[in-house]
A protein has these predicted regions:
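PP2C/PPM-type serine/threonine phosphatase catalytic domain
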Residues: 1-229
């Protein structure tokens, strides 16, 4: 077995007064492990990797990626997205969510990955149905408004559980606890307590225009491949 060196890091958070252990792997073992953990794959013309080397299942990978080619009336649109689940550092609740115990924070990112792409596709389909060649600003508005509306709907779902503040004030602690821990209700609450970044790229059928939508601490980079590289 290859010899490894163990070191510590503060992960860039010196104020937390905590250190994490990690192993410095030599080559070729480093490349071998990176290849094994990255789950490298190709989907059509898109190459993807995703990895979280931490072995603790409670902090398993919260990244999700979506690769879709949408056949719409004016041609095929290329949709690519990355969603990264986010956890609040402080979850200060007067009532403990049963589902939160041992929770890794996947509810929101799973919901976003499963539903936001289809929501954007439907909104885009309506636009190109009426205008076969929408201008760039129209597509930008579709992305912006759809993402904003989707985010608002997550919050509205929570408010439907307690629509009347006066009625809520009259509920006992047990009654509130029973509501928030009632099956789907706890998932609705967790989606608001947790979160997800959004990074989307969209290319039109003629491949002449590219749109990028970014929400949260994520960024997209663009490069150009030379012939033979």
């Amino acid at each position: 077995m290859s010899k490894t060196t163990r070191k510590t890091t503060d992960m860039g958070w010196p104020d937390l007064d905590a250190l994490w252990m990690y192993n410095v792997l030599p080559e070729p073992f480093l490349s071998s492990e990176l290849s094994r953990l990255s789950l490298a794959n190709s989907i059509g013309d898109t190459d993807v990797v995703t990895f979280q080397p931490c072995p603790n299942p409670d902090v398993s990978n919260e990244d999700r990626f979506i690769v879709k080619d949408w056949s719409l009336p004016n041609g095929t649109w290329s949709f690519r997205a990355i969603f990264d689940g986010r956890r609040s550092r402080v979850l200060d609740l007067p009532f403990q969510l049963n589902q939160l115990l041992g929770h890794a924070g996947h509810e929101t990112v799973d919901y976003v990955a499963s539903n936001l792409p289809n929501t954007i596709q439907n909104a885009l389909a309506k636009v190109v149905h009426h205008n076969n060649a929408p201008d760039a600003s129209t597509i930008s508005n579709v992305l912006t408004s759809t993402i904003a509306s989707f985010d608002e709907d997550i919050g509205k779902a929570l408010l439907t559980l307690f629509p009347d503040p006066e009625a809520l004030a009259k509920l006992s602690d047990k009654e509130i606890r029973d509501i928030i821990n009632d099956g789907a209700n706890s998932t609705t609450i967790l989606r608001c307590m947790l979160g997800s970044t959004v990074l989307i790229s969209l290319v039109n059928p003629s491949r002449t225009s590219l749109w990028i939508a970014s929400l949260g601490d994520c960024a997209a980079g663009m490069t150009k491949c030379s012939m033979g590289d």
